[in-house]
Each structure stands twice: as C-alpha cells, then as structure tokens.
Regions:
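Intrinsically disordered, low-complexity proline-rich regions
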Residues: 4-6
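A polyanion-binding, active-site-adjacent surface
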Residues: 10-211
C-alpha cells in the first residue's frame, strides 16, 4: 500500500464511513433464503481483517461472529500464539465474512453452504470494507473464505503460507487459517496441526499485527 493510500484509509472519516457501512450490513434483506438478522463484529477500524464463512445458528441470537464453540477454538489459537483474549481479538481485528446471515440447515441437519448467488450478493460488503479499511493483513478462515481470495485444491497448499493478493483495487497480505469447527479434525491432526502453528507464527510476526 502506498503512503497516500494508507493516509486516506486512516483519515478521520474512516470510522464514520465504517459505522455507516456496518449499519447497512445489519439492515440488509437482499437474500430471501437467508435467516436474518445479518451479523457484524462492529465498526472496528483496523489494519487487520478476518473473513469468516457465514454465521451459525447461535451467532444471530448473540449478535456477533464466532460467538459459539468454533469461536472459542479460534480465540484459543490466538491466546496460545500471542496472549490475546477473545475481547482483544474482537477489539483489534475487523471481522468480516463471506455471507453475513445464517444460511439455515440442510435436510441432513448440517449448516447449509451459501449458494453462489448469495456469495455474490454479499461480496459487495467485503468490497466496501476493503475500500474503506485498506487492510494490510487479511485472515480468511475456512475453505469458503480462502477461496474468495486464493484458488487452491487442498488446505495443505495454503495453510502456513503468506500470499500477496490484490482484491477490489487494493493489495494486501493474506494468511489463511483452517476453520475452527469442532466437526473438522483437520486442525487437530498432522500435518494440519503443524501448519496451523506455522500460520499463527506468520500472523503475529506480521508488521501490521503489533500495532493492531
């Protein structure tokens, strides 16, 4: 990011623009199959952005992303890596998502994966967030989130690595993370466990992280 870009993104108007955007996200009713309300982590002005996949059934009730068991795992990773609590993460990282509303359940009882149309509709919010914040570091969490920024076949191809990506007219570093879902053993077994540790080390060493 150029110095001029950085100064624009950190201007006094950034917080106001972000507040306005978050209000629009929370009021969104564009996807008829989605279960509202939309979930937001709030207007946190930060150089670091996380991108989740979509809220689960608990998040709309509790009013914040990663509010249930997967969140406990996610925040536990950062407690181990740098001593951050859940409150630290929420206060210092802007929390975005591929889709902002709970997609509902499948007939089999699992969470429904957002369809391509829903992902495309919700992508307007991510574009606006990137334009306003000009993040230096983006952390996509889970396969669906990673695929919005990087094309890949296997998690082992991307976890534990840093990528330089241009999206919505802005260039930033991307360090992917696996989804912390309890239904997935990937991050608890090798090589996933070691690759996750490597990814977290890259994150806490990133130049944007200490100043968050």
């Amino acid at each position: 990011m150029s110095n001029s870009q950085s100064s624009i993104c950190n201007s006094p108007g950034t917080a106001k623009r972000l507040d306005t955007l978050v209000a629009k996200i929370r009021a969104c009713t564009l996807c008829p199959k989605m279960h509202r309300p939309a979930v937001s982590g709030g207007a946190v002005v930060s150089r670091v952005m996380s991108i989740g996949q979509a809220p689960g059934v608990k998040e709309p009730i509790l009013g914040r992303p990663f509010a249930w068991t997967a969140g406990k795992t996610l925040y536990g990773w950062f407690t181990a890596a740098c001593g951050w609590s859940e409150a630290d993460f929420r206060a210092r990282v802007y929390m975005a998502a591929v889709c902002r509303c709970f997609p509902g359940k499948t007939k089999a009882g699992g969470d429904r994966v957002p369809d391509p149309g829903e992902i495309e509709t919700c992508s307007r919010w991510l574009a606006d967030e990137i334009e306003i914040l000009c993040p230096a570091l983006v952390l996509p969490i889970g396969k669906l989130a990673i695929l919005q920024l990087i094309q890949f076949e296997k998690l082992t191809d991307v976890i534990g690595k840093k990528f330089r990506v241009t999206k919505h007219g802005h260039e930033f570093d991307v360090i992917p993370l696996p989804h912390p879902s309890g239904a997935s053993p990937w991050h608890r077994m090798e090589p996933g466990k070691s690759l996750l540790t490597r990814a977290l080390k890259l994150i806490v060493k990133h130049e944007a992280w200490p100043g968050v």
